[in-house]
């Protein structure tokens, strides 16, 4: 069931590669995708807690001509279908296809959306009623943490392992324990 789209609630911001799925460089095909242990459970748990769940992901492979936005979208659609099987959902996936060193002209530029800049998080907080003070970001790179900080939310660096165990620790650290 979808939450009330007008009610303000905290948000969980997740990086994709290295947090939701194993980072194997430029993932855009289902057959190359492997869930991080605990990732689906975390998304479902935060859905059940009434939080927004957003993915904010740099996808420079698009600018570099390695895959298309349509191929990336097909993977994101598949992720949504897989999550739905376990009663979980991502409220929106924000992606940045731009990179200054791209090879595809229309994507070769600097962008406020490209982490460590905060554009994708700010867009999510503009598109949805988010309680910023209780929201946080989990990423596997310093750029994720810097983007969170620039957007005014806390950031936590995930270095691998079980994402559910990690978010238990984060919630306790934030005083949001279950």
Language-model-derived ranges and their functions:
Residues 14-16, 57, 138-140:
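Active-site flanking residues adjacent to catalytic metal/cofactor-binding acidic residues
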Residues 20-37, 62-71, 85-88, 98, ...:
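Metal-dependent phosphoesterase signature
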Residues 2, 7, 70-92, 100-137, ...:
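Asp-based, Mg2+/Mn2+-dependent phosphohydrolase catalytic module
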Residues 2-54:
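Active-site neighborhood of HAD-like aspartate-dependent phosphohydrolases
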Residues 52-58, 91-96:
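Short beta-strand segments at enzyme active-site cores
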